[in-house]
Amino acid sequence: MNYIGIDIGSTASKVVVRGSKEAYFVLPTGWSSKETAQTIRGRLREMEINVEDEATKVVATGYGRIVVDYADRTITEITCHGRGGRELAGENCMIIDVGGQDTKVISLRDGMVYDFLMNDKCSAGTGKFLEIMANRLGVTLEELFDMAGQGTA
């Protein structure tokens, strides 16, 4: 059995394969998320992984998740981050995703997404967004950086 996670983001696409085969790769998304999804299918085929095989399950997330026509399931980025954060850092943690188009801050409590914030501007305002998030979380920007440095995942 192979489990494949595909995140087609606005600037980069990430793929992780777990199971009887293990692999990961990153590639630029480019102008067309749909073409990127097909490029990923081709790369997996080169690795002798057939996404149509009954023993392969594909989950897609990210801005381009809808165009991964071979995905068995699509999941929002917030949900994926929550599950990944719980797996890597425990049931109570904070995840910060600085992406190509936005930044998300996700808070987990008891293993569930408790709250999340997202900037509503392009990534040009990312620094200001971190400052606003620190203020919202009741910490200084320096404390936020220290907290990030203490992360183990």
Question: Across the structure, where does each feature detected by a protein language model lie?
Answer:
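Predominant activation on well-ordered alpha-helical scaffold segments within soluble catalytic domains
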Residues: 38-42, 79-86, 127-134, 142-145
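Short glycine-aspartate micro-motif
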Residues: 3-7, 55-57, 93-97
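Glycine-rich phosphate-binding loop plus the immediately following alpha-helix
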Residues: 110-149, 153
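Conserved phosphate-binding catalytic cores of ATP/NTP-utilizing and phosphoryl-transfer enzymes
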Residues: 63-115
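Short glycine-rich, Thr/Ser-proximal phosphate-binding strand/loop in the N-terminal lobe
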Residues: 2-43, 113-122
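Short beta-strand-loop/turn "lid" adjacent to the catalytic site in phosphate-handling enzymes
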Residues: 19-29, 48-79, 114-116
